[in-house]
Amino acid sequence: MQSKFSTFGLPGMMLLTFAAMAPPAQAETVAYNADLKGSEEVPAVTSAGVGPAEITYDTATKKLMWTVTFSGLSGPATAAHFHGPAEQGKSAGVVVPIAGITSPIEGSATLTDAQAAELAAGKWYINVHTDANKGGEIRSQVVKK
């Protein structure tokens, strides 16, 4: 009686061995940024407020990390969030609240696979709210560098 493995032959067995030894997919850190301004809000807001955001996502740990810096707002920031999924010019709900409202804001969160896919597809935005602009004073889509 023949073994199941003898039907593969030597080349087949070598292929299976090499496939089993292949290294796992490499994790990477993906860099994103955002350029927050009033004209990006929906609807647009007249504001002298501006702010860059530097964002990274680690594919191994699923950790999103950010630094959001802003100035020129109509008053103190009252809230800040990541929203999605939404294309530029569209609105969506909060997906990750940003703790702290004093510039610069630094923080992190662990994403689900679905959230990471939305982020990678450019479907997330950040905005910063004030009392004068409760819906958001400055906003920007999060884009890969």
Regions found by a protein language model. Give the residues of each.
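Metal-centered catalytic cores of metalloenzymes
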Residues: 2-5, 23-80, 84-145
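Bacterial N-terminal signal peptides
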Residues: 11-20
